[in-house]
């Protein structure tokens, strides 16, 4: 996937949010995707931070603005502003801690309570490099994703497994929604956003599911 300088022209700006319990690896997934870095000593995020990455998606230059927030309960008052304008989300759990997977349903309810119903959501089972400690079976996560019409992948921010694939898939699905609206509207629709505006995914139909997991 080709990279682009932050100051280059882009066709779309998509806001993505990372959600899930504290310690599941949200910040390291973000730094792995945007900077190809991993910090073994990363501390829990305090408040909100975001990073951007500009990349090519189906021939268009897309700038992803990716927001990361603390998973701790005491920081959840920020949710309304955090979710506002988001068109994609990565719902992340730790494959070695079943409780983080159990809490995914609550995070999903919160997300859907603050965003458009057709937001593109990818369920992420992170830390799949720790195969000997796995507490959440892939089949269990797939079943949840199917019930909730989510995409699904297992990732490792540590060794970069599926990190690029996961973010790119979410951006690709958002772009497909925007492209479909443009075609259905007879070309350049007046309600399609310009540079720097938020993409609204309101008019999309059912979300298809794509499964992915760590290779053995």
From Swiss-Prot:
Induction pattern:
By auxin.
Question: What is the annotated localization of this protein?
Answer: Cell membrane
User: Which SMART domains does its entry note?
Assistant: RAB, RAN, RAS, RHO
In this record, what's one Pfam family? Ras
Q: What happens when the gene is disrupted?
A: Slight increase of primary root elongation and lateral root branching and hypersensitivity of root growth in response to exogenous auxin.
Regions that span the bilayer: none
Provide the topology term for how it sits in the membrane. Lipid-anchor
What biological-process GO terms show up in the record? cell wall biogenesis; protein transport; response to auxin
User: A single Gene Ontology molecular function, please?
Assistant: GTPase activity
Q: Where is the lipid attached (S-geranylgeranyl cysteine)?
A: 213-214
Tell me a GO cellular component. Answer: cytosol
Output the PROSITE patterns linked to this UniProt entry: RAB
Its domain of life? Answer: Eukaryota
Question: What InterPro entries does the record point to?
Answer: P-loop_NTPase, Rab_GTPases_membrane_traffic, Small_GTP-bd, Small_GTPase
Residues annotated as binding GTP? 20-27, 68-72, 126-129, 156-157
The entry's stated outcome for residue 126 to I is: Decreases GTP-binding
Q: What task does this protein carry out? A: Involved in auxin-mediated response. May be involved in vesicle trafficking of components involved in polar auxin transport. Binds GTP and GDP and possesses intrinsic GTPase activity.
Miscellaneous notes for this chain?
Plants overexpressing RABA1A show reduced growth of roots and shoots and smaller leaf sizes.
Question: What is this protein identified as?
Answer: Ras-related protein RABA1a
Q: Which organism is it from?
A: Arabidopsis thaliana
Taxonomy of origin reads: Eukaryota, Viridiplantae, Streptophyta, Embryophyta, Tracheophyta
